[in-house]
Amino acid sequence: SVGQYGPLVHFGGVIGDYFSKLLRDQTSPHILLASGAAAAISSGFGAPVAGLIFAHEVIVRHFSLKAVAPILISSVVAHTISTEFYKSEPLFQLNIGGISNFYEIFPLAILGLLSALVASLYMRGLTGFLPIPKKIPIFFLPIIAGSICGVVGLFYPELLGLGTGTIRLLIEQPHSLAYIAILLLGKLLLTVVCIRFSLFGGIFSPALFIGVMTGAIFSIITSYFFPEINYSLLAVAGMAAVTSCVIGGPISTILIIFELTSDYQVALGAGISVCFANLLSARIYGHSAFDQLLMNRNIDIHQGRDRLFLASKKISEILSRDFIRLVPEHSAEEMINILSKADNSEGYIISPKGKLLGKINITALI
């Protein structure tokens, strides 16, 4: 019940990291890593522009002119090659339609807030504390997860795999409220079980699935009061809102929706839900599930790249013993002679017991 796009992005990032080690100091490692991730998004979704923005928004964490060219080239080349070998239409090229009147903005905004709650619940399950009995061997956990998925799949096969067909079906036409609610709860729980029980996979595709279910449920309930509401638009907006909270990339999510649907109006409508969802999700949970996973490993990416680099460096790696050793018994003249012969301007006064007493500059001695 996990996705394939997360591992695809990781694979692209690993390739970028490999090339950064080959090139050493010729380019910034994070730019090549971001280029690999952008290429993965571009080829996986058929979305080269979204790949570019995703790399800047989620990985680089700022828009850099230095990084635009290599990331864009990687994204476009990956898209060109993938479409050459695998010709495919946009994943959700359906007749959805955009906002038809001003009053539809309010349901989209409310849907964004609801999606933030669902996304936060999903992310809490993925990253929060999960008490697993220590008696269960680690290698046995994936077997348990696989068994649970197998049993559930006998009754609801829609919950297994990427669920692309189910997503398309629910965007096109509504189904019973109970059925959609079961799919929403089932997908959320199954994905959490799979990830927490060490089954390898991504959380992006399940977020799309959960988001569509959220939007569909909200749209069906809203249609009781507003029969003319655009059901498909709300379903897609829910998908975008939940996904943007999970990956922490609102702009790239809107662009992914645009490139998946080939409909600018749909992207605009979904953008309203995305904005409200991220405002609330950032307050009640945080930036994204990925950030929290790093926080669980005591890596706070909000400190900035420089501070993270310093935190990862050991003093032993940069410690230098190349200094001029002076003793308190030296006279000023002796110190000047020692520093002059060593062609150095400063020395360190060390006691016989090896204690640092201070530093002295040659200009202070003259």
Give residue spans per PLM region.
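A short, polar/charged loop-to-alpha-helix boundary motif
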Residues: 364-366
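Alpha-helical transmembrane segments and immediately membrane-proximal extracytoplasmic
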Residues: 1-312, 317, 321-357
